[in-house]
Structures are given as C-alpha cells and as structure tokens.
C-alpha cells in the first residue's frame, strides 16, 4: 500500500473496533435469528477501563447503527448505559447472517466524534438478498421519498430529500436527533461510514417542517453507496433507503487535517 492509500484508509471511518485509544468490546447478543435476548457491550479506554463519560451528539450519547453486511436489515437504535459502562437493549435478529455494528460516540475525554465497529453473526437459515439497484427514490409506509443530488469524491455533495404522501408534500416532519431527518451513508463492500451532516439550524422543540431536508457529504472513493434516511411524522420514525454511485478520483487524505467521522 503506497502513502496515498495509507492516508486514504486513515481518513475513512467505521472500519475498526479501536480508534484514538477507545475500544468497542465484544458484543453479546442472541446467537440465533428470531431469538429474543439482549445486545450488550462496553467501550473501554487505553487502560482497559470501561468508559462512562460521553457527550451528547444529535441528542444522544451513543448511536448504534446495525446493518447486515449485504446492506439489508438496517436499524438505528439507542441503548442505555448503566453505572459501570455497560450499554444494552432488548434485541432480536430478524434474519440470519453477518452484521456490522457501529457505535458512534463522543468521549468526554477527547470531545471528538469516533465510530467503532465489530461484526456479529446471527445463526439460522440464511436467505441472501438480491443486490439493490441504483435508486434515488423509495416508498415506505405510504410515504414517497425522493433524493436529488450526486455523490462526488472531489467536492462536498448537497443531497436533498423530499417527502410526499398521496402526491402531496409532507410539511409535518418532526425534529429527530437534532434535525428533520437523519442520513447514514455506507460504502458498498467494506461498509465504511461516511461523514454526513444536515444543513440548517437545529429545529426548535415542537416545530415541524418539510417536505425537504438537505444534507452535505463527500465520498472517499468512486463506487456504490448505500444511504438510509430516518424521518419522523406523528411520532413515528420511518426509514427510506437509496443506492447512489459516486464519481471522480479517489481522495488523497491530507495528514495535516483531522480525519473524517461518521454522522448520526
């Protein structure tokens, strides 16, 4: 691997269980698909001590993103932490397979956002998914969601999603995780995590908006990317999915700049 490849790898997050002296511990979870149980883990520091001090980011101290390695079975959840640093939540794998689990956090000790990841296996009869086609539109729970924008490796891309229902724009999007929508972007294949941030000011409690929500992001390499949009209407969270292709040359990371991190 040459120096440019090394720098690029360092700038892409969500590929390691350890970053900046913090380690995502072994994840315990139900061993079989469709089995009820608990998913639990700790995050430890360089001395092996579980960390208990985290800053809230996008309204939560930890964002847990879970997706099967073929890009299906996406979930974005928020476990609770006990006094000893053990994060947990009730859990059931809905399908057998290999899953990537991402913990998105801001340790108080550094004040820097990091993304740690591990792979977890759920045993059972595996049903492979057909690769999703390129798509900038999705329909979920009766809502039509369209995405406008092009991913690029050479500049920040503006991605605007628009939500409608029965042909009418939805103007009652509620605040969710500090914005009117939350977008996760993963590089197909290794499932590297992109930094994505919403545009505009944080909404006031009780405010509503719509039908458009805009995000900014930049792809590290050309290729296909899997995008997952969470939005909330009438206290219900819905998830739309898209597949985009990024164009342009691979980035050469500047070692003098801070590495990018995942959005939440």
Show which residues each predicted segment covers.
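Intrinsically disordered, low-complexity terminal tails/loops enriched in metal-binding residues
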Residues: 1-264
């Amino acid at each position: 691997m040459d120096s440019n490849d090394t720098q690029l790898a360092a700038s892409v997050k969500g590929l390691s269980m350890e970053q900046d002296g913090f380690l995502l511990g072994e994840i315990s979870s139900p061993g079989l698909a469709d089995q009820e149980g608990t998913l639990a883990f700790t995050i430890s520091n360089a001395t092996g001590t579980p960390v208990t001090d985290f800053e809230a980011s996008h309204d939560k101290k930890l964002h847990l993103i879970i997706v099967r390695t073929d890009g299906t079975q996406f979930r974005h959840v928020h476990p609770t932490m006990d006094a000893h640093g053990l994060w947990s939540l009730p859990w059931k794998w809905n399908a057998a397979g290999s899953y990537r689990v991402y913990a998105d956090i801001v340790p108080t000790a550094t004040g820097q956002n990091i993304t740690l990841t591990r792979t977890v296996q759920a045993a059972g009869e595996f049903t492979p998914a057909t690769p999703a086609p390129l798509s900038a539109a999705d329909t979920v729970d009766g809502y039509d969601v369209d995405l406008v924008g092009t991913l690029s490796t050479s500049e920040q891309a503006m991605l605007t999603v628009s939500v409608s229902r029965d042909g009418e724009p939805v103007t009652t999007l509620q605040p969710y995780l500090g914005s009117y929508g939350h977008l996760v972007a993963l590089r197909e294949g290794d499932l590297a995590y992109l930094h994505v941030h919403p545009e505009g000011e944080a909404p006031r409690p009780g405010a509503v908006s719509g039908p458009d929500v805009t995000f900014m992001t930049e792809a590290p390499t050309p290729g296909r990317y899997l995008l997952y949009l969470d939005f909330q209407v009438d206290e219900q969270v819905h998830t739309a999915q898209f597949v985009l292709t990024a164009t342009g040359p691979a980035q050469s990371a500047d070692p003098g700049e801070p590495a990018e991190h995942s959005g939440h």
